[in-house]
């Protein structure tokens, strides 16, 4: 059984290999360690392997961790990404603590995040979540509504629109994975023609990371392959 540090080294090597295979520059893909349900001790172990970017799905759990590391390990300067579904009654906590939000899919959430972002903090870096698979069970805006939401976000003073995020249909077939990710990449390229600051594609997890990187992902979200199986009773 590998340690968290060994897992990070293994995944980093996989990312570098995938980048090389498709002719992408080294370090063009960021590893986001998904630490939901994991204790601060596990996150601390990951930082000892050089990991600085962490993703959280649950607002209060994530805020508790951010506060802990700000108080006890401020020298680590960790970057925190909110990657879960976001309800309007939880936006203030996210706006006040996180560095990134990957899951904006409606105007109300964007407006509240900008309004509630403290003036002494830099703009919140945000991604629009797009439902490319059309699955009713998945969050995300429909592709045809994307450009209207992007226009709104671009005018909000305390948000910086950086790109797109998706969770495509879970399929084992590599060509199907690649096609789904390519669809999101093409939408991002269209947006970037109008908004030059757009440079981020958050897509790819353990089972489809290779296809995501080939399609242009800049952030892959990896959880159990780093930290092991999750204990959801912590959030019951």
UniProtKB/Swiss-Prot annotation:
Gene Ontology CC: cytoplasm
Gene3D superfamilies per UniProt: Alanine racemase (3.20.20.10)
InterPro entries the UniProt entry points to: Ala_racemase_N, PLP-binding_barrel, PyrdxlP_homeostasis
Domain of life: Bacteria
Gene Ontology molecular function: pyridoxal phosphate binding
Keywords noted in UniProt: Pyridoxal phosphate
Pfam families, sorted: Ala_racemase_N
N6-(pyridoxal phosphate)lysine: residues bearing it: 36
Role played: Pyridoxal 5'-phosphate (PLP)-binding protein, which is involved in PLP homeostasis.
Similarity comment: family membership: Belongs to the pyridoxal phosphate-binding protein YggS/PROSC family.
HAMAP family the UniProt entry points to: PLP_homeostasis
The name this protein goes by in its record: Pyridoxal phosphate homeostasis protein
């Amino acid at each position: 059984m590998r340690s968290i540090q060994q897992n990070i080294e293994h995944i980093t090597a996989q990312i570098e290999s995938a980048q090389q295979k498709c002719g992408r520059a080294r370090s063009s893909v960021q590893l986001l360690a998904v630490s939901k349900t994991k204790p601060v001790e596990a996150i601390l172990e990951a930082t000892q392997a050089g990991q600085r970017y962490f993703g959280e799905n649950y607002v209060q759990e994530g805020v508790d961790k951010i506060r802990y590391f700000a108080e006890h390990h401020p020298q680590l300067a960790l970057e925190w990404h909110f990657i879960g579904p976001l309800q309007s009654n939880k936006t203030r906590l996210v706006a006040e603590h996180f560095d990134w939000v990957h899951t904006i899919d409606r105007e109300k959430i964007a407006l509240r995040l900008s309004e509630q972002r403290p003036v002494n903090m830099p703009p919140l870096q945000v991604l629009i979540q797009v439902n490319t698979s059309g699955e009713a069970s998945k969050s995300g805006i429909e592709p045809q509504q994307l450009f209207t939401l992007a226009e709104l976000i671009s005018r909000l003073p305390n948000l910086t629109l950086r790109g797109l995020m998706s969770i495509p249909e879970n399929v084992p077939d590599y060509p199907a994975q690649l096609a789904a990710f390519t669809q999101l990449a093409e939408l991002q390229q269209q947006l970037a023609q109008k908004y030059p600051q757009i440079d981020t594609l958050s897509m790819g997890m353990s089972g489809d990371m290779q296809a995501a990187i080939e399609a242009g992902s800049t952030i892959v979200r990896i959880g159990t392959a780093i930290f092991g199986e999750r204990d959801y009773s912590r959030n019951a």
